[in-house]
């Protein structure tokens, strides 16, 4: 906590502190704490910020986050990779909509950000996603392994994890620590567009959230016709990065040995769905790509 507060007070964290303040200034934080049930897993979630509020914030944040890469021509710079990612995503989103029919109205979108040294991907509330080219190229992903990554990110969105993380941040009084509601409110309104990026992407998921996303993501991929065994092979590749040290973003995932066992168990559980999907016509759902406004 102290380290986070030092970062918030630093120049790099100034905008982020303003964003946290926006939650209070604009009434996104309610006075009475509330809990709800995870729409996918049934787990009880703290929800001071509603899913719709998180979706609204993420929509603006997504545009802001992609703006530098778009300006530099790094969004969907490789048309073949972009088409590959979008095609897989459309199959996965069709299965996501089966989980939660109301998500058919989400503005689903995925882009590939050209960044050869970045092994990462993210999803925001409302189905706004990005995958970095480095994770595809460095790990030499098969379609099934790529489907596991995208399915995992979709699962975070389906499970309202962005809103949950925003709520946990509020409950920890981050928005009230040392920052007064002073200055031009129009500035707060402008920086509020990036709120979803800060709390929806930069704050890490809890291990409970990661475990949920593993399970739901593997099931989505299996239903879409992608071999669930790819989850374990993907994990082995990721864990072998950087001379045996997994990427930093895996730090909140379960321990390697236990996660490997769990992924294998889940693969066995969902294999019948995969076998069924292989002999059927797999549906798709429209997903916007990098050329979308």
Tell where the protein language model's regions lie, with residue ranges.
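A Zn2+-metalloprotease active-site environment signal
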Residues: 2-293
